[in-house]
Design a protein with these regions (language model features):
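Basic, helix-initiating cap at the start of DNA-binding domains
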Residues: 1-23, 27-39, 53
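Generic hydrophobic, amphipathic alpha-helix propensity
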Residues: 8-16, 33, 58-62, 66, ...
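Short hydrophobic/aromatic patch on the recognition helix
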Residues: 38-48
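Hydrophobic alpha-helical connector segments
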Residues: 57, 71-98, 150-153
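Amphipathic alpha-helical packing segments from all-alpha helical-bundle domains
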Residues: 64-71, 83-87, 116-141, 151, ...
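Amphipathic alpha-helical segments used for helix-helix packing
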Residues: 84, 96-118
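Hydrophobic/aromatic-rich alpha-helical bundle segments in the mid-to-C-terminal region
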Residues: 119-124, 139-192
Length: 192
């Protein structure tokens, strides 16, 4: 049974994702994406009006993937929201073991774009959305200040990703998880 060939749009986005992850968004030109995806220039521009639109599509796809991985890891940790908060670090540990891991795509993109640009705004929106989700988990866990606990956990995630970008090792995610567990224990009273 033959599998269907991905659409031209999907090939372009997949190629751009790999290149942006490996070289950054400024380190990759449209001509390289066209050459490596095997599409004509007109095809790329039929799907993405400009490189900025392609970068936004990359960020949206990465957001969907990463938030899905976080949710899956949290749910796999069990029904207790305290365990789910610590479980997000399983997604981080798995990500750091992927070949070519270069840290957080959103942090990298923020560093390559001008504040106020669409891509920079999308990176900030992603970080806010993750913190909002963590805040809801912290609220469900009974944290006295859910937003503060979520902020601290998100900083642990970002710090572990930055460390693993320099030296990909699962120990960073494990250390961040243990630090998160201490914060969770302090912020969330034990349930009887």
């Amino acid at each position: 049974m033959s599998s269907a060939r991905p659409s031209a749009r999907d090939r372009i986005l997949s190629t751009a994702t790999g290149l942006f992850n490996a070289h950054g968004i400024r380190g990759v030109g449209v001509d390289r994406i066209i050459a490596e995806s095997g599409v004509a220039k007109a095809t790329l521009y039929a799907h993405f009006r400009c490189k900025d639109d392609l970068v936004l599509a990359y960020l949206r796809a990465t957001d969907t993937h990463w938030r899905g991985a976080l949710t899956e890891a949290a749910e796999a940790a069990g029904p207790d929201p305290r365990d789910q908060l610590a479980g997000v670090f399983d997604a981080l540990g798995a990500a750091t073991l992927r070949d070519g891991f270069r840290g957080c795509a959103f942090t990298r993109t923020a560093g390559e774009t001008e504040p106020g640009s669409a891509a920079h705004t999308a990176t900030a929106e992603h970080k806010r959305a993750v913190r909002a989700w963590l805040t809801e988990l912290a609220r469900a866990a009974g944290a006295a200040d859910p937003a503060q606990l979520a902020l601290r956990i998100s900083l642990l995630v970002d710090g572990a990703m930055a460390a693993a970008a320099l030296e990909p090792r699962p120990e960073f995610a494990e250390a961040a998880r243990e630090a998160a567990r201490a914060l969770i224990a302090e912020a969330c009273p034990a349930r009887v």
